Amino acid sequence: MATLHAPAFELPEILNTKTNLADARIGAQVIECSDDFFAEAKRMLQFEAPIFVEDKFDDHGKWMDGWETRRKRHAGYDWCIVKLGVSGKISALDIDTTFFTGNYPASASLEACYAPNGDLTGAKWQSILENTELGPSQHHIFMVNNDAIFTHIRLNIFPDGGVARLRVYGDVHIQVTDHEQTLDLLALENGGRVIAYSDAHFGHPRNLINPGRGVNMGDGWETKRRRAPGYDWCILALGKSGKIEKIEIDTAHFKGNFPAEVSIQAVYLENATDAQLIPQSMFWSYLLEAQPMQMDHIHEYVNEILQYEKVSHIRINMIPDGGISRVRLWGKIAKS
């Protein structure tokens, strides 16, 4: 059976620093749906791009990589409630109908609510996307203008049909309750995000903060071969400022293309704009001086860390180029 892969899609640059709050890898899950007869709603939250497998059928019909409901034979519409992996402010939506050509919804709307205890009884749902027409086999990017914090969303499709992927881009909101807990302050699920980078030819630096170890070489940050003096770099914001106790640099799957060395610079800045950070980052002090790298290996540093009471942003320098899979900054959230 031939397998077709989704066409390459370039996310709008404005969303490159946002987190997909509906990513199953950080805990997003389907709570309830009106119907998922042809394809389970949870597939809609998968990180991987959708595929189409020719001649693949199951007991319900054609297998589709997404959420698909049966044909509606009465008035009404279908819906799906999703608990976001982390609460946050929503900036944009991507309703992706890739490979749904004769079975995509005519239109869709989306509501959101804040229910931190998970009880949706009496929840106040806000409309963040009015009923909007959809097209076949394509991404639909919708910007959202709402400053509220949300924990759940409800996707409504009219009248029925299928959605390959639903992505909800925004900024993670973390309510600090424990300043003594050690956690990865850079992790995607804790609000870490990419601000800028020198190059991302083979893999985007947003992969550095993904959950778990990299699944392959494509699930990491990899730059093109450098043919001029210098080195590659990326700037990231921690989800919360804190004191760093342990650093992990993982070169999983990078064997003939790992960097010779990696160093990390750091700074603590309150209310800094992303634009002002980029030119100043080259002058930040070192949190970790240049360390030699090995192929396909987790490098751990504790005693090598240069002391900072608070860190809010880091700059990772990959000398001179190459690829790394993950970076973890273990520490405690700083007290105000």
Swiss-Prot record:
Pathway listed: Nitrogen metabolism; (S)-allantoin degradation; (S)-ureidoglycolate from allantoate (aminidohydrolase route): step 1/1
Keyword Hydrolase appears in the UniProt entry: yes
Catalytic reaction equation(s): allantoate + H2O = (S)-ureidoglycolate + urea
Molecular function (Gene Ontology), one example: allantoicase activity
Hydrolase as UniProt keyword: yes
HAMAP family: Allantoicase
The name this protein goes by in its record: Probable allantoicase
Organism listed in the record: Acinetobacter baumannii (strain ATCC 17978 / DSM 105126 / CIP 53.77 / LMG 1025 / NCDC KC755 / 5377)
